[in-house]
């Protein structure tokens, strides 16, 4: 521990961790939720959700696995407070899946939709206000209301060992490779290879890294 952390602060940290483990016990009826996860205040976990051990779920976060495969969260992940990880946005058409691999950190106030398949690779760190939308409205027909034209569902894939800044948006069909860095506020609308720095709206490759 850092020398700046006093013994009293450390004791409070340990107490808070114990409380979060106790909170997690109410989710143990779900056989796919580990006994050793840390759950914040007013967290909601429902439907098809699998969470591996040592994962932290922040206060007021909602995880809903209503979908074909549901939500899978790996070991040692950290999901920030006030996040929404939701497979289906309505009950008329079930979503697919959200697969968050081991050692992923997602900042506070993030939204991950699962209308089609979303994968976040292991060891990826993500800032606050991430937004992932794995579907897109079709709007080409001028005679039909946009809401009635259906959606595309190509999915979103984020590689391993990436660093994604705050307020980044991924749209349907977009992906980034392994070891990519994405600048804050970028909008990812297409596919990017491994080992690149990506910035802008719409995002472009700035350089190889």
What are these regions (language model features)?
Residues 36, 155, 195:
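A residue-level signal for beta-strand positions that form part of recognition/binding surfaces
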């Amino acid at each position: 521990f850092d020398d700046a952390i006093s013994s009293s602060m450390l004791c409070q940290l340990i107490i808070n961790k114990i409380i979060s483990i106790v909170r997690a016990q109410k989710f143990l009826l779900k056989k796919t939720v580990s006994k050793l996860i840390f759950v914040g205040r007013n967290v909601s976990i429902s439907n098809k959700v699998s969470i591996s051990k040592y994962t932290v779920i922040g206060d007021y976060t909602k995880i809903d696995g209503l979908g074909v495969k549901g939500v899978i969260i790996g070991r040692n992940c950290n999901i920030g407070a006030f996040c929404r990880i939701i497979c289906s946005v309505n009950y008329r058409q079930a979503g697919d899946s959200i697969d968050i691999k081991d050692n992923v950190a997602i900042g506070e106030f993030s939204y991950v939709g699962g209308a089609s398949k979303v994968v976040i690779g292991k060891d990826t760190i993500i800032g606050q206000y991430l937004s992932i939308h794995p579907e897109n409205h079709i709007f080409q027909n001028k005679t039909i209301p946009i809401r009635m034209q259906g959606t595309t569902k190509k999915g979103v894939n984020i590689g391993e060992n990436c660093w994604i800044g705050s307020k980044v948006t991924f749209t349907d069909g977009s992906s980034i490779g392994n070891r990519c860095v994405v600048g804050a506020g970028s909008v990812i609308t297409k596919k990017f290879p491994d080992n690149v720095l990506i910035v802008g709206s719409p995002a472009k490759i700035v350089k190889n890294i």
